């Protein structure tokens, strides 16, 4: 064992409790044995260094340190759990148990429910004061069922139903229905802002367990998508037969006007409805090529040299010419015909007529009667400008690879300068 250098110098403060060896002293070896009985030193050995008369034998002991220190104390010291601080009647350490040990604290589930209800109240207050769209659904928790009492109607659906009611000259029923929806929405908002015990229980049940959306509150109908004509929409069923058509149900056409009448736009809906008398749209199959196409094949899509090439030639556009000759005289934008290809390069329907040009050979082959993309209200009906009608500066701009800022021609280019 290592000899204590401080003992040799007479400065060891631990005496027999030293970990190092004290030569000549009883209990040497650093075993930290209990201190021997102190005896008064003899006259001849007052300044000696032995076990009975050590100068620093009763110095600071390790066990004499207090258990709790300002620096945190020892590791085995009793510490109260976090959150048990009692500001009213604290113990000597400043931490203690609650004043009422028999009071049962709120569980985590109850805290979550309280926080959820507070969030719902705050959301509906913001919804009401911000002026957001009323006819929408609301769920306070992600991927949870919507709270009952609200209906989902888009502005486009309301606009469509307005036109349907306008056609049937029954706008008063439309206004009454919308006003009733608004009043029901406000009543539901007020219920959520002023929650009662029964309302809280039903609300938590809706959010947690989920409710059957078959019979939502306020009679909005049995379907998730509310409809003005369905039993859920607040409309008097005996008012008119056209009110029953005020619905948002999915159909092959975007909507179907009342029987025996013409749609607001002079025809059936553009997206896939069937033809009717007085229709300004000559589409007989669903738009964008979803129906059975006409006899248009890839053989007509060729790069044969044109005889009188122009963009007004057949097949360049899939729009029928009836857009410029509707019964009302107005210009409407019909859908793409399914008889043409996606880009419109193909043989058009034989029922369409040319708007800008007489029948000629198609740019990419195939002949027939042309259809046009734009209406005939433009000042310049020609899609191309002959060379002799162009100024020198304009012709230079068309022949250059890039236009110069401020010198871009306002006329169409000559057909000779177009490359495919």
Curated annotation (Swiss-Prot):
Subcellular location: Nucleus, Nuclear pore complex; Nucleus membrane
Segments of this protein annotated with the region Interaction with GLE1: 365-420
The keyword tRNA-binding belongs to this UniProt entry's keyword annotation: no
Gene Ontology terms, MF aspect: zinc ion binding
Residue windows of the FG repeats: 14-15, 82-83, 95-96, 218-219, 220-221, 228-229, 265-266, 271-272, 288-289, 345-346, 364-365
UniProt membrane topology term: Peripheral membrane protein
A cellular component term, taken from the record's GO annotations: photoreceptor outer segment
InterPro entries named in the record: Nucleoporin_NUP42, Znf_CCCH
First and last residues of each zinc finger (C3H1-type): 1-25
GO terms classed as biological process: mRNA transport; nucleocytoplasmic transport; protein transport
Keyword terms, alphabetized: Glycoprotein, Membrane, Metal-binding, mRNA transport, Nuclear pore complex, Nucleus, Protein transport, Repeat, Translocation, Transport, Zinc, Zinc-finger
Protein role: Required for the export of mRNAs containing poly(A) tails from the nucleus into the cytoplasm.
Subunit structure: Probable component of the nuclear pore complex (NPC). Interacts with nuclear export protein NXF1. Interacts with GLE1. Able to form a heterotrimer with NUP155 and GLE1 in vitro. Interacts with XPO1.
Name recorded for this polypeptide: Nucleoporin NUP42
């Amino acid at each position: 064992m290592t000899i204590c250098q401080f003992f040799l110098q007479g400065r060891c403060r631990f005496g027999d409790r030293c970990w190092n060896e004290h030569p000549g002293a009883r209990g040497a070896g650093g075993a930290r044995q209990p201190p021997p009985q102190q005896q008064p030193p003899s006259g001849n050995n007052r300044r000696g260094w032995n076990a009975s008369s050590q100068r620093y034998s009763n110095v600071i002991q390790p066990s004499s340190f207090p258990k709790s220190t300002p620096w945190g104390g020892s590791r085995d010291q009793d510490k109260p759990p976090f959150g048990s601080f009692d500001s009213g009647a604290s113990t000597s350490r400043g931490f203690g148990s609650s004043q009422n040990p028999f009071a049962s604290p709120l569980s985590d589930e109850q805290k979550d429910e309280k926080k959820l209800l507070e969030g719902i109240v705050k959301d509906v207050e913001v919804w009401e004061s911000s002026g957001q769209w009323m006819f929408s659904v609301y769920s306070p928790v992600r991927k949870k069922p919507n709270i009952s009492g609200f209906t989902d109607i888009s502005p486009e659906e309301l606009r469509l139903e307005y036109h349907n009611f306008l056609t049937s000259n029954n706008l008063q029923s439309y206004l009454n229905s919308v006003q009733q929806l608004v009043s029901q929405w406000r009543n539901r908002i007020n219920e959520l802002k002023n929650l009662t015990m029964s309302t809280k229980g039903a609300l938590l049940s809706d959010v947690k367990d989920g409710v059957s959306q078959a019979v939502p509150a306020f009679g909005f109908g049995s379907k998730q998508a509310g409809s003005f004509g369905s039993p859920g929409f607040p409309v008097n069923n005996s008012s008119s037969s056209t009110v029953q058509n005020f619905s948002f149900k999915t159909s092959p056409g975007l909507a179907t006007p009342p029987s025996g009448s013409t749609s607001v736009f002079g025809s059936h809906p553009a997206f896939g409805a069937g033809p009717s008398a007085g229709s300004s749209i000559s589409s007989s199959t669903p738009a964008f090529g979803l129906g059975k196409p006409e006899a248009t094949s890839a053989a007509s899509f060729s790069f044969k040299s044109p005889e009188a090439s122009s963009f007004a030639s057949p097949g360049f556009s899939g729009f029928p010419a009836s857009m410029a000759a509707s019964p009302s005289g107005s210009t409407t934008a019909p859908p793409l015909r399914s008889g043409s290809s996606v880009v419109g390069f193909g043989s058009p329907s034989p029922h369409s007529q040319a708007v800008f040009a007489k029948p000629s050979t198609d740019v990419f082959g195939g002949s027939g009667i042309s259809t046009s993309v734009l209406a005939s209200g433009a000042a310049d009906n020609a899609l191309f400008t002959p060379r002799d009608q162009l100024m020198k500066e304009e012709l230079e701009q068309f022949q250059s690879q890039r236009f110069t800022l401020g010198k871009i021609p306002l006329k169409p280019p000559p057909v000779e300068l177009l490359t495919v």
